Amino acid sequence: MELKNYQKKVIADLQAYLYTLKQSANLAESWRNYWQQKDIAVGSGGVPAYKDNIQGVPAVCMKVPTGGGKTLLACSAIKHIFDFMPTEKPKLVVWLAPSDSILEQTLKNLSNPDHPYKQALDRDFGGRVQVLSKAMLLNGQGFSADSVQHILTICVLTFDSLRINSGRRYDRKIYQENSNLADFAAFYKNDAVLLEGTPETALIQVWRHLRPVTIVDESHNATSALSVEMLNNIYPSFILELTATPKNNSNVVSYVDARELKKENMVKLPVIVYKRNSRESVIVDAIQLRGRLEQKALEEEAITGNYIRPIVLFQAQPR
């Protein structure tokens, strides 16, 4: 599947940022240089200054409206990210999903050779791609010190499989001793990167040796202190966030306006937005509107026999 014009622009923005990052390892400086190329100031009156949330780790966000193809963008971005890294770096990606349903959908689509996501990955990496679930990783299924040197390996997990209070982290299997991963401990000897008090054969320790590229889907759900600790524990080499609604602590490298989606026929129905002055009025008006739509739906059912159930969706605050 060919990228839409706005998606190509997002990838071009990422490439431009990666180029400035290669010129200067100072994250704040490379961020300023990136925006200066666009004649946009950083700081007062311009875009926010770079936020070094995971100290020393480049972390940027693609702000793309819902329905804009964030997953395809992420798949297309992976090669560009690895291209700016040393060629000998293991091509490991930890892909974090916010829920079990999105996890299952992501695993299915990334693994399906007929799906555009998998086709994009196969094209960029010559078909040398494997997608692993948490169970496969813990069992060492297709995951070895040798395989990560030659194959793009994408590990798909949920936030909750990693995110836990540090005092209880050993309740999670990725922090537990794992004989299936013992060959990694024999192959990698840099003890300085190890997480203190954690068995060296634990999956989290393997990741820390390999320093994966980490993709955070719906990253607005991963802003809590526990989420920051989760990312620190992974010890990534690069973080790519995907969301339609970034929080204030995100470094947004590329913005897509909803009108761009409409131009590309990605939005099939009109989007109508009303502004209200308080949360209470938003809730009351939304429920009342749903009630009016319900009445019309019942009238339609009486005529056609077809029932349409109107619903209201309220987005909860992340934990």
Task: List each language-model region with its residue ranges.
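Conserved interdomain linker/interface between the two RecA-like ATPase lobes of SF2 helicase motors
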Residues: 252-319
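Conserved pre-motif I regulatory segment
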Residues: 1-63
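Conserved Walker A/P-loop ATP-binding site and its immediately adjacent core
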Residues: 88-122, 158-164, 317
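Short hydrophobic/aromatic beta-strand immediately N-terminal to the Walker A/P-loop
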Residues: 61-63, 94, 313
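SF2 helicase catalytic motif II
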Residues: 161-164, 171-240
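Conserved helicase ATPase motor motifs in RecA-like P-loop NTPase domains
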Residues: 62-68, 218-222, 232-250, 265
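Motif I (Walker A/P-loop) of helicase-class P-loop NTPases
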Residues: 70-81
